[in-house]
UniProtKB/Swiss-Prot annotation:
Modified residues (Phosphoserine): S148, S254, S274
Domain of life of the native organism: Eukaryota
Primary location class: membrane
Segments for region (Disordered): 32-61, 240-309
Organism in which the protein naturally occurs: Saccharomyces cerevisiae (strain YJM789)
Membrane topology note: Single-pass membrane protein
Protein family according to the UniProt entry: Belongs to the PRM5 family.
Keyword Transmembrane helix: yes
PANTHER family reported for this sequence: CHITIN SYNTHASE 3 COMPLEX PROTEIN CSI2-RELATED (PTHR36089:SF1)
Any one GO CC term of the record: vacuolar membrane
UniProt keyword Transferase, yes or no: no
Signal peptide boundaries: none
Protein name: Vacuolar membrane protein SCY_4732
UniProt keyword annotations, A-Z: Membrane, Phosphoprotein, Transmembrane, Transmembrane helix, Vacuole
Length: 314
């Protein structure tokens, strides 16, 4: 059997607005705990809807209750597990970390400033010491033997060596612009010379005269300077050796040149304006006074014949 949807016909009748009647029942306890909430029950009666049909509608009553818990933090008084931050500012951790980083940077800056200051001071002291040593080099007083000690003796030796070096440099600078001692162009007799012979002994004597003249001039210039007086026997010995080498030059004439007679030598010197042979040379006398003769070399065939004949022993 099939049921069909039956749609009844409803006719609406105009009427006035219904009146709403509400009844509220509330019960209140004398003592309520903190976590209890007043529950209210409300019941409402809805108006009934009447129609010309056979259907009716009725209202329902509903009741609801909500429980809300109140949260209160525990007290920090006497509790060792809770940090009492009431008397501390906000962001204490960030302040501490920033203070540590700032202290590290400040210490690095102080170390850099101190190291620069010390290095600059050390450099200035060294440069001042070197400048003062170069400025007052040689201007020192020689202490007596009673007041001297090994340290002072070593200092005096170093100062004397420095003075000698400075004097040698000064002397070399004085003679840098001077003419070379063995330059034949400076010979005043070159224009009047008829031969090509050059006398080195004459040039040596000229150099000796110019050297003595320059030396006397230097002594007159620096005679008032006490820093140039170096009282050492090494200086005197070197000066004597230098003078001996200039006074006794080696013979520069060729050994193959034949000896001439005295009369011919005098005419030769007058003609060529040369002093060769007039100055006694120690090396020449030593060579002429030696009685030994060089061994005569033999041909290989003659030496072999002497060996075969028994006149020569190997």
């Amino acid at each position: 059997m099939v049921k069909k949807n039956f749609i009844p016909s409803v006719s609406l009748v105009r009427r006035d607005l219904p009146t709403l009647v509400t009844t509220t029942t509330s019960s209140t306890a004398l003592s309520k705990p903190t976590s209890s909430v007043v529950s209210e029950t409300s019941s409402k009666s809805l108006p009934s809807l009447t129609s010309s049909a056979f259907s009716t509608s009725s209202g329902t009553t509903s009741s609801s209750s909500l429980i809300v818990a109140s949260i209160t933090p525990p007290s920090t008084v006497g509790n060792p597990f809770i940090l009492n931050a009431a008397d501390k500012p906000n962001g204490t951790v960030y302040i501490a970390v920033g203070a540590v980083i700032g202290a590290i940077f400040i210490s690095i800056l102080i170390w850099w400033l101190v190291s620069n200051y010390l290095s600059r001071r050390f450099t200035m002291t060294n440069s001042y010491a070197n400048d003062s040593k170069n400025l007052y080099r040689g201007h020192h007083k020689h202490s007596s033997s009673l007041q001297s000690n090994p340290f002072d003796i070593n200092d005096e030796k170093s100062y004397m060596q420095d003075d000698w070096d400075s004097m040698s440099q000064l002397e070399s600078s004085q003679y840098e612009d001077a003419a070379s001692p063995f330059n034949p162009i400076q010979d005043p007799f070159t224009d009047n010379r008829r031969s090509l012979f050059i006398s080195p002994t004459l040039q040596v004597s000229q150099y000796e005269k110019s050297h003595s003249r320059h030396q006397s001039k230097d002594t007159n210039i620096f005679i008032d300077d006490p820093s140039l007086y170096v009282g050492t026997y090494l200086e005197e010995e070197e000066e004597e050796e230098r003078k001996l080498n200039l006074n006794r030059p080696q013979r520069a004439a060729s050994p193959e040149r034949k000896e001439k007679k005295i009369n011919s030598m005098e005419g030769y010197h007058k003609r060529n304006q040369s002093s060769l042979g007039l100055i006694p040379v120690a090396s020449a006398t030593s060579n002429t006074s030696s009685p030994k003769k060089a061994h005569k070399r033999q041909a290989p065939s003659m030496f072999l014949d002497d060996v075969l004949n028994g006149r020569e022993i190997i």
